[in-house]
Design a protein with these regions (language model features):
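Intrinsic disorder/low-complexity detector
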Residues: 1-9, 45, 61, 69-74, ...
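Accessory recognition modules or surfaces
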Residues: 3-9, 19, 42, 47-64
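Residues in flexible loops and secondary-structure boundaries
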Residues: 16-18, 45-48, 65, 78, ...
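An amphipathic, aromatic/His-enriched active-site/gating alpha helix that lines ligand/cofactor pockets
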Residues: 17-38, 58-97
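Hydrophobic alpha-helical segments
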Residues: 23-25, 48, 53, 72-73, ...
Length: 112
């Protein structure tokens, strides 16, 4: 299993619209392609708004296949286009990290 950490920098004025779109549309469509979202957070320090979420994947091939299907989804493309036209920019930047646990780290949930 691998974990993927996604960090989106979002315009402060669009925070609520972004979160609504993610909750109502992105997460639902991601579930269609077997995305396992473990948790989601926001960080609003330093005059920036960041949306952070952690995913679990079986392996890199599973992750790549899931993202390819999600990005090719016509419903998601239509939603992104429509909401961006109505509300403006939703994402200013994306940081994508693939996390490998250290040998001395406990697994998520505290299991060894």
């Amino acid at each position: 299993m691998i974990n993927q950490l996604r960090i989106y920098t979002i315009p402060p004025d669009n925070k609520d619209h972004f979160l609504d779109r993610f909750r109502d549309h992105a997460a639902r469509i991601m579930a269609r392609y077997d995305f396992r979202i473990l948790s989601m957070w926001t960080d609003e320090r330093n005059s920036q708004v960041k949306f952070v979420y952690l995913l679990a994947w079986d392996d890199a091939a599973d992750m790549d296949a899931g993202w390819s299907k999600f990005m090719a989804d016509t419903e998601w493309s239509d939603i992104k286009k429509r909401t961006s036209e109505e509300q403006g920019d939703f994402v200013l930047g994306i940081e994508d990290l693939i996390l490998t646990p250290c040998a001395f780290s406990s697994a998520l949930g505290g299991d060894q």
